[in-house]
A protein has these predicted regions:
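SDR active-site lid
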Residues: 169-242
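A short, exposed helix-loop element centered on a Lys and neighboring polar residues
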Residues: 113-114, 161
Length: 269
């Protein structure tokens, strides 16, 4: 059955790839992008692909008027996919960057989601609706120097789990999607962010040491996986009426996370 799906952060990466894929499968897509210059190129790409069921709109989560407008649209599934990441040592990162990362990844998606859900319930058509959150493998464990970003994903995991319990009565389904470190440019850009503020004259963490740690990770197979695998899974998961609450891809990362969580019980100080 065809669904109407609103996607945030559809201007690039997972969101764009999955939006196009779901449209090709017959779903009606409202693909939203952060800034106006992204709108026309994505519309033109959809037209070139012959996708008449692909609508592109601007939705800047920092703009309350954009959020209010999006909350008035009719759709069956809200996919909160937009996000931003700050990396670097938690003990030295400027707190205003931590606060901003939570604003983009947690608070503003929650504002959008609350308004959408409350409208569904108020209008009596909540049964069968769905909200999906793009979390991360980092929503389930915390590697050094990624603590700020993954703490926002830990928060999303808690919000999603609470919503699943709170909204069952209303027939609203909740899911998370937890990608591994796929090569979309997102993680690579995030790894560049600390070098805006990290200063060898002021900070204890040295730029060269942090850069080497990031570069070593991205040089491994786990640090540059082909995103097609994840996009294909998103195309299946997001429109589905049934499925798992939490969807970790690939399987090797799911297994690693399970082992990490078991081992955490014996972690020593």
């Amino acid at each position: 059955m065809s669904k109407t799906i609103l996607i945030t952060g559809a201007g690039s990466g997972f969101g764009k790839g999955a939006a196009i894929g779901m449209a090709k499968n017959g779903h009606n897509i409202i693909a939203t992008v952060q800034v106006s210059p992204q709108v026309t190129p994505l519309r033109e790409e959809a037209e070139q692909l012959g996708l008449k069921n692909f609508r592109v709109e601007r939705l800047d989560l920092t703009d309350p008027y954009d959020i209010r407008q999006a909350q008035s649209w009719d759709f069956d599934i809200l996919w909160n996919n937009a996000g931003q990441g700050e990396a670097g040592p938690v003990w030295e990162i400027p707190v205003d960057l931590v606060r901003r990362n939570f604003e983009i990844n947690v608070f503003l998606p929650l504002v959008l989601t609350q308004g959408v859900i409350q409208r569904w319930v108020r209008e009596g058509n909540s049964n069968g609706k769905k909200v999906v959150f793009t979390s991360s493998m980092g929503g389930l464990f915390t590697p050094a120097n990624w603590g700020t970003y993954v703490s926002t994903k830990h928060a999303l995991e808690s919000i999603a789990e609470a919503l699943q319990q709170e909204l069952a009565t209303y027939g609203i389904r909740i899911q998370t999607i937890n990608p591994g470190a796929y090569y979309t440019g997102y993680n690579e850009t995030m790894a560049d962010n600390p070098f805006r503020w990290l200063d060898d004259k002021k900070n204890f963490t040295k730029r060269a040491d942090l850069r080497k740690g990031f570069d070593d990770f991205f040089a491994t197979p786990e640090g540059k996986m082909d995103p097609k695998e994840m996009i294909d899974r998103m195309i299946e998961v997001v429109p589905a009426d049934t499925g798992k609450f939490r969807n970790v891809v690939p399987k090797v990362i799911e297994d690693m996370l399970k082992q990490h969580q078991i081992a955490a019980w014996d972690n020593q100080i």
